[in-house]
Amino acid sequence: MGVTVENISAGDGKTFPQPGDSVTIHYVGTLLDGSKFDSSRDRGTPFVCRIGQGQVIRGWDEGVPQLSIGQKANLICTPDYAYGARGFPPVIPPNSTLKFEVELLKIN
């Protein structure tokens, strides 16, 4: 249970966000069957959030700090690190494992 980081392409390997940092990220969120439920890329606007402060799901709070600037990776988040038994109706069913393709664009 938790979050698994699967590297797609390397970042700079030395600049990592710290808890409390604001980050700018592009992401595509899918269910394990490939159904897309959200995408900053489709909106054409990167997502900005503060990491490690409960503003996003736990999988992001723990997974994003493992990425360096420019890195693209999949974050596989088990339900307890995503939306849990509640899900996010009507888009995300209860107890769903989620896959986010994320790209860390910058630390603000």
Curated annotation (Swiss-Prot):
One family from Pfam that matches here is FKBP_C
Q: Name one GO cellular component term.
A: cytoplasm
Regulation of this protein's activity per its record = Inhibited by both FK506 and rapamycin.
Keywords annotated in UniProt: Cytoplasm, Isomerase, Rotamase
Q: Which residues form the PPIase FKBP-type domain?
A: 20-108
Report the domain of life of the source organism: Eukaryota
Enzyme Commission designation: 5.2.1.8
Q: Extract the InterPro entries matched here.
A: FKBP-type_PPIase, PPIase_dom_sf, PPIase_FKBP_dom
State where the protein is found. Cytoplasm
> GO: which molecular function terms?
peptidyl-prolyl cis-trans isomerase activity
PANTHER family associated with the record: FK506-BINDING PROTEIN 59-RELATED, PEPTIDYL-PROLYL CIS-TRANS ISOMERASE
Q: What is this protein called?
A: FK506-binding protein 1
Organism name: Cryptococcus neoformans var. neoformans serotype D (strain JEC21 / ATCC MYA-565)
